[in-house]
Amino acid sequence: MALGILGRKVGMTQIFSPEGLAIPVTVVQAGPCTVTQIKTQATDGYNAIQLGYLPTAEKHLTRAQRGHLTKAGVTELLRHLREFRVDQPEAYQLGQKITVEMFSPGQLVDVAGTSIGRGFAGYQKRHHFGRGPMSHGSKNHRRPGSIGAGTTPGRVFPGMRMAGRLGGGRVTTRKLQLVQVDPERDLLVIKGCVPGVEGGLLEITPAKQVGNKR
């Protein structure tokens, strides 16, 4: 369990290695985040640190949210609050700033965000079903095929892959490598792609699993 950081996806680009290889990367504007609450085993039953991110206008926060930040002694209004489990919450203080300096180039991280919503999608797009014949009198072009038997069991089993809403859910991409860390501009350059749209909120944490899982 380790503390992470909040950020927003800027977009994708590419950089070149010393050998001249093009590396696709995602640029993330991460932090600075503010410690807004410290939870301990004695007070809350578990150890965690709550971070606030992205200064915003007062109209975007409820009275309860503003009171929570005031109680923590945080002067600026922060739009996003997220909690991270930690082993030693006593190592942090209310109002402390968390920046990208906690990471180093070459480190593996897990990135969580909300995937791009695709709306209502069919079987092929949502579940990668194969299509039916396109000619010779076939009318089964993009149909799903059988979804179960008849009288027995007389119902569609739960979990049957069918058409429905695609995307728009929480997704975590694991073990992505940090290519560059820029503390002056609060930027993380991550190899590969991360979930979500440009400007979407991301949670970046040190990788929980390093190596092959057995």
Curated annotation (Swiss-Prot):
Q: Where is this region: Disordered?
A: 129-157
Q: How does it assemble?
A: Part of the 50S ribosomal subunit. Forms a cluster with proteins L14 and L19.
Q: Name one Pfam family in it.
A: Ribosomal_L3
Q: What does this protein do?
A: One of the primary rRNA binding proteins, it binds directly near the 3'-end of the 23S rRNA, where it nucleates assembly of the 50S subunit.
Q: Which GO terms describe its molecular function?
A: rRNA binding; structural constituent of ribosome
Report whether Glycoprotein shows up as a keyword of the record: no
Name of this chain's protein: Large ribosomal subunit protein uL3
Q: Enumerate the InterPro entries for this protein.
A: Ribosomal_uL3, Ribosomal_uL3_bac/org-type, Ribosomal_uL3_CS, Transl_B-barrel_sf
UniProt organism field: Synechococcus sp. (strain JA-2-3B'a(2-13))
Q: Which UniProt keywords apply?
A: Ribonucleoprotein, Ribosomal protein, RNA-binding, rRNA-binding
The answer to keyword RNA-binding applying to this record is yes
Family, according to the entry, reads as follows:
Belongs to the universal ribosomal protein uL3 family.
**In its UniProt record, which GO terms are filed under biological process?**
translation
Fetch the SUPFAM superfamilies from UniProt.
Translation proteins
So which residues are the signal peptide here? none
The record's GO CC annotations read: cytosolic large ribosomal subunit
NCBIfam families noted in UniProt: L3_bact (TIGR03625)
